[in-house]
Amino acid sequence: MLITDEIYMKRCIQLARNGMMNAQPNPMVGAVIVHDGKIIGEGYHVCCGKGHAEVNACASVSKENENLLKESTIYVSLEPCSHYGKTPPCADLLVSKGFKRCVIGCQDPFAEVQGRGIQKLRDAGIEVTVGVLEEECKRLNNRFMTYHGKHRPFVTLKWAESADGYIDGHISNAYTQMLCHKRRAEHQAILVGRHTFEKDHPSLNTRVWYGHSPKPYVVSSHSLEIPGNFNLLNSEDIPCILNKLYKDSIQTVLVEGGAKLLQSFMDSGLWDECYVEKGSSIISGSVKAPVLSTDAHLVSVEHCFGQQVSKYLNKK
């Protein structure tokens, strides 16, 4: 592996992040085409059902540079697909273009790929390097990797608590509310418990941020009248909940409450990231905030106009 390989792979990762909102449920992927130390094309997967990163990178190459592809290296953050889905196989495209070399960040865990794209390139005589910035490329698509590797959705927990540790009150400010809606737009589904649904009658949609609204689910072991666009999960068992969401093809779920449901997820260990907003006011409420598990690893703290938002990852 060359130092220059890492430089261009970092650019692939940077490009891939542009697909956060619209690429899902597909992975975020970036691609860069390099000839003689110069980038002559680049692209990323913009939207599910549209051209993949490799397709867009090839399309960005000017006509006068197309003859250089046979002496070029293409960098891609995820293994090129080898199957027909909504678009043709990218591995076939790279073979047809005659690339000299292909550098791949990480292998695709999707059952239809899993090394087949890499093998197809090698069988065609293309020099293939795999594993450049592998961990960074896997983290880029931790949601996709979790869904296809662990056969469950990527789970994000979120709550806001007062300075004295209660969650039953108005705590968020305008900025942190905007962050909350940004996270909603980044997830395919949103989940609340019965008590939260009956007390707050939440719409659970995305209003103060650009993007789609997640599919709303309510967890209740009791019969419950819900709006037509809501979905009822009639088991409070966390593995059962996640299995149902997996069968519904939900790759990412945001759990917003209430305290009982959040604590159940935390205690089960079946969560991936957690955002805790800490307010500055004392409200002397009646519902205590969930307690973080020993597996919760603090990775960042953001100060937002008097509020503190801490991000934790499950290190288990």
Regions found by a protein language model. Give the residues of each.
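Enzymes that bind and transform nitrogen-containing heteroaromatic metabolites
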Residues: 2-27, 42, 65-68, 86, ...
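Proteins enriched for Cys/Gly/acidic motifs involved in redox and nucleic-acid/cofactor modification
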Residues: 22-23, 49-50, 118, 133-160, ...
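Helix-turn-helix
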Residues: 30
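Zn2+-dependent cytidine deaminase-like catalytic core
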Residues: 33, 38-136, 264-266
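Short, charged/polar low-complexity linear motifs in solvent-exposed/disordered segments
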Residues: 58-60, 147, 187-188
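Solvent-exposed, charged interface segments at domain starts and junctions
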Residues: 89, 129, 133, 137-144, ...
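Short acidic loop-to-helix transition motifs that present clustered carboxylates
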Residues: 110-113, 135-139, 197, 237, ...
